[in-house]
Amino acid sequence: MLTEKQLDKYADVLLWGLKTARTGKYKKNDIVQIRFNLPAVRLAEILNEKLLKMGINPVLRMNSTPVMERSFYDISDRRQLVFTPPGEEELYKNINGSIFLHAPESLTHLSGIDPGKIGKAAVARKYLRDIIDKREEEGVFGWTLCMLPTEELAKHAGLSIKEYTNEIAAACFLNKKSPVEEWKRVYNDAARIKKWLNGMNIKSFLIESENIDLEITSGAQRKWIGISGHNIPSFELFISPDWRGTKGKYFADQPSYRSGNYVENVRLEFKKGSAVNIEAETGEEFVRKQLAMDRGANKIGEFSLTDRRFSKINRFMANTLFDENYGGSFGNCHIAVGSSYSDTFSGDPKKLTREIKKNLGFNDSALHWDLVNTEKKRVTARLAGGGKVVIYENGKFMI
């Protein structure tokens, strides 16, 4: 497991991420929520102390254990399934930051649960996420998250707990003298690539690999973002496209654990922006029901690319945070079905109303599910002026 020294460095990196991810500055008496799984309690304690010393008011929330979560979906009636505790909305309307410490004790405890029930609960809480999304657009809220090693994660990744811990430490630079300085370097290197991408007037992207032939429309008033402090680690650059122009075939060769279910080899075919054919070698019924959660669940909310020169992650980690940042031999691309990111809007985010989002093709959903492809691939940008530029090939941006 991570040492006390590594945990202290991890906390410093998370606080850097929290500050970097928010456009406005934190001030004394701001409210920051620390949400954590039970195995992450020590890191929560360290963060709690550091936030108090900063003059911040920490609000600590422990996630349900696997037994609690299973009981919730097994036993809850329709009203219990959509219940929101008193005070939750008030907290979300006043919160200034959130740090999530992901340390799952089980990845499969919800297998066998009706995916429709999981979706119903997610849809019922979506209004809370809408509140903090708006606060983020206004510059008064920021968030970050990380993952800690657990026996369950290591087992499903096919690693020992020591090997798994070492992978996390390496990916997050926790063995370096100053991990924060390392992240600042990555942040600056990524800024150069984002400037290059955003300097082109891109109309659409063509993604080609052995099993992918997909066209994605960039959309008006968009910008590439990423490596912004939100996720630790994060090496991806991404955009929320205009979902309406998506067409073609996509394949996720990276397995995925979601809501206690295991999914493998997902194949999606898009027509007129929506996934019309859905297949999976494992977990197909679950995938189908997740993508039927609401009207936006079968549409794209994100398109992402990871440069293998940035990421040290070269093994399957059984966790989306790491797997969506896979470097390996050919980097990765992923799409997310479901909700989009309004911070990829190139205009003033404070003026981004629900109506403007809809008109620009920003997808809206209670779902956000990253589906990762690690095949050798080429991504070609089709420019508004008619030209074409290969922007990504063999795992790296062609800058």
Q: Which residues does each predicted region cover?
A:
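Long, well-ordered mid-to-C-terminal structural blocks that present hydrophobic/aromatic surfaces
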Residues: D242-R295
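Glycine-rich, charged/polar anion/phosphate-binding loops
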Residues: D130, R192-I193, N201-K203, S234-L237, ...
